[in-house]
Amino acid sequence: MHAWPASEVPALPGKGRDLRIHDTATGGRITLDPGPVARIYVCGITPYDATHMGHAATYNAFDLVQRVWLDTKRQVHYVQNVTDVDDPLLERAVRDGQDWTELAERETALFREDMTALRMLPPRHYIGAVEAIPGIVPLVERLRDAGAAYDLDGDIYFSVDTDPHFGEVSGLDAEAMRLLSAERGGDPERPGKKNPLDPMLWMAARPGEPSWDGASLGEGRPGWHIECVAIALDHLGMGFDIQGGGSDLAFPHHEMGASHAQALTGEHPFAKAYVHAGMVGLDGEKMSKSRGNLVFVSTLRREGVDPAALRLALLSRHYRSDWEWTDQVLAEAVERLARWRAAVSRPDGPSAEALVEEVREALADDLDSPAALAAVDRWAALQSAEGGTDEGAPGVVSRTVDALLGVAL
């Protein structure tokens, strides 16, 4: 599966700061020092509907991570998956009378278009769950043969009790885990499981649903968590720098994935930092496909909204915060974009040297994009009020905003 085209990232003078990021597993900020190649895995979409602003907010956060690392002169090995076979996708296809593969391909193509328009840097590897199945089967077999997985009526489950580190990612107690498991695709009430929290690794073939050759596992399809583990281990290995996604993935998805990988390799941790973006709401509820309370990126683009304004709207909220999408949020972003473009359109202006460092410092401090925007606002206000004589300043500001915030002025 191919990703989307990359926009050019301008080189800035000097060197960026090392990233200090909030780690869900420890509950505090840690400073990451990835070495010459930073490694990041971000969980991708389940392609049964268009990209909404909640999706965009998540991918914006991890785009900032890439840009901070690139500014430190590192290479970035970024991997993202597509969950192109899953119950919600199959259910939507049946509801709408569509072929599930055509639905997945169409929505994945639209996602690529949205990411291109928003100038999100693409992953080096963009991998669908279906194409990963040949690598998933032997991992499930290894877990079963090692006693970390068991058969239940033809389905294969992972035994969470075999991982001594289970629970470290989310920090939740057993009851909270059980409640969230039931809400987020688990089956804690299924009789016969060793632990109610045990997640499915391999689902035996069901009538009317797609299935694949699972060798000794039998015909079926993989569970959600093992898909990401297989892709991450194949392309990044253990101990990569950031496992990223929305905050609703901390449990069960990232918790279970870490346990799968740790049981497979005997190594810990799966990732050095677990980084989670907040939820975007609409009308008082989390924006989600299941609720149908969605604002689509593609719809806003068709209505003529500049993608750069959408990007600024996302950047106006800290990535870890939960926030509401409103017309006012968008209006403020449109107005900010106009101010910035007017400021950099002049032939000269106030010195921008301090601005570059302020934006760098803000983003290195747990991706504080609101502080970065405020720094650019101050320069634009000074330009509007007093102007300046530095002929290179508007260009420096434009390149800084492009390189570090992904906004083309």
Swiss-Prot record:
Keywords, comma-separated and alphabetical: ATP-binding, Ligase, Metal-binding, Nucleotide-binding, Zinc
A single BP term in Gene Ontology: mycothiol biosynthetic process
EC number per UniProt: 6.3.1.13
KW Nucleotide-binding (keyword) present: yes
Highest taxon of source: Bacteria
Subunit composition and interactions: Monomer.
UniProt-recorded name of the protein: L-cysteine:1D-myo-inositol 2-amino-2-deoxy-alpha-D-glucopyranoside ligase
Species per Swiss-Prot/TrEMBL record: Streptomyces griseus subsp. griseus (strain JCM 4626 / CBS 651.72 / NBRC 13350 / KCC S-0626 / ISP 5235)
